Regions:
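Gly/Pro/Ser/Thr-rich low-complexity, intrinsically disordered segments predominantly at protein N-termini
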Residues: 1-145
């Protein structure tokens, strides 16, 4: 895996900060957790949102409310390989944010080893997680353009 660049870290940290400030008490925002998808499969997403009632190490794919990957050098891998893994394990919503352009690919809902929909959303548009509609963010608001 490639080392994370400066821009990647800024986007990841700002996103985590904004989500944490907006999240209700029943939603936990986990930065870079070990996410156990199955007995032999785990990934470390940049941000994982899940019900606070479930401890982060116990969260499985279908428990997740939102998984976010910020991609700088790993964009193709995050859009293909990780999307297949997350879909196959029932993650209901998966975002890939291009750290350079702030374009976001919103994958929903899982269907087998893929997602039924994966539109690309511009940074000036409001991103609203389907499982956590109280959280909304426009990546333009991060002030990184």
């Amino acid at each position: 895996m490639s080392p994370k660049g400066r821009r990647h870290e800024i986007v990841r940290l700002e996103l985590g900060y904004r989500f944490t400030r907006q999240a209700s008490r029943d939603v936990f925002v986990a930065p870079e957790p070990q996410f156990n998808l199955g007995p032999d499969t785990f990934l470390v997403p940049d941000v994982l949102l899940h019900p606070r009632a479930i401890a982060t190490p116990d969260v499985r794919g279908s428990d997740a409310l939102l998984v976010v990957e910020v991609a700088e050098t790993s964009l193709a891998y995050d859009l293909k390989t990780k999307a297949m893994l997350y879909a196959a394990h029932g993650v209901p919503e998966y975002w890939v944010i291009n750290a350079s352009t702030l374009m976001t690919t919103m994958h929903t809902p899982p269907s087998g080893n893929a997602y039924a929909s994966a539109p690309e959303i511009a940074p000036d548009k409001l991103l609203v997680p389907t499982m956590v509609p109280g959280l909304a963010i426009s990546l333009d608001s991060l002030g990184l353009q």
